[in-house]
Design a protein with these regions (language model features):
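A structural preference for short, hydrophobic beta-strand core positions in alpha/beta folds
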Residues: 10, 60, 125-126
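A short SAM/SAH-binding and catalytic strip from SAM-dependent methyltransferases
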Residues: 22-42
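A short glycine-rich, Lys/Arg-flanked "PGG" loop and its adjoining helix->strand segment in the class I
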Residues: 39-57
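Short, small-residue-biased leader/transition segments that mark boundaries at the very start
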Residues: 1-5
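SAM-dependent methyltransferase
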Residues: 54-113
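Conserved SAM-binding strand-loop segment of SAM-dependent methyltransferases
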Residues: 6-15
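Core SAM-dependent methyltransferase catalytic element
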Residues: 115, 119-142
Length: 142
């Protein structure tokens, strides 16, 4: 028997018309990336409040890029006056075809937890990976 998808859409997560409700929102394969920049986190959490049913959650993975700034002695040197070290400017290319550049956010768990708390969510560390990566569960505060 042939199976097919009957109801699909390609939608910008932040589009106002995207307003269904979900028990769980999966944001995997560095799911935090779509947020783009730290300054977009309040908008992200506002949108999650609209999309999540009561008791629902977001499962999101990301990575802490601080290891890229690690010195030989193990210290980490980050310019605190500069942009957040997990904000990355991506541009995809295949052979001679280049796409437009776009913002992508890698966020460490502590920073995610801080922004979650500031926006009415709790962040729980579900699993730590072997290379600075993690899975987090974001739930609305009661």
């Amino acid at each position: 028997r042939q199976m097919c998808i009957r109801d699909r859409s390609q939608t910008n997560l932040f589009n106002e018309q995207f307003a269904d409700e979900y028990d769980t929102i999966l944001m995997l394969m560095n799911g935090s990336g779509i947020i783009g920049k730290l300054e977009n986190l309040p908008d992200f959490f506002r949108k999650m409040k609209l999309l999540l049913r009561p008791g629902g959650c977001v499962l999101m993975d990301s990575s802490n890029l601080s290891y890229l700034f690690e010195e030989e002695d193990g210290s980490i040197v980050i310019d605190l006056a500069g942009d957040y070290y997990g904000e990355v400017d991506f541009q995809m290319q295949y052979k001679n075809v280049k796409g437009d550049s776009f913002d992508w956010l890698y966020i460490d768990f502590q920073t995610l937890s801080l922004y979650a708390a500031e926006n009415g969510f709790t962040a729980k560390l579900v699993k730590e990976g072997t290379h600075y990566d993690y899975l987090a569960k974001l739930s609305r505060q009661a």
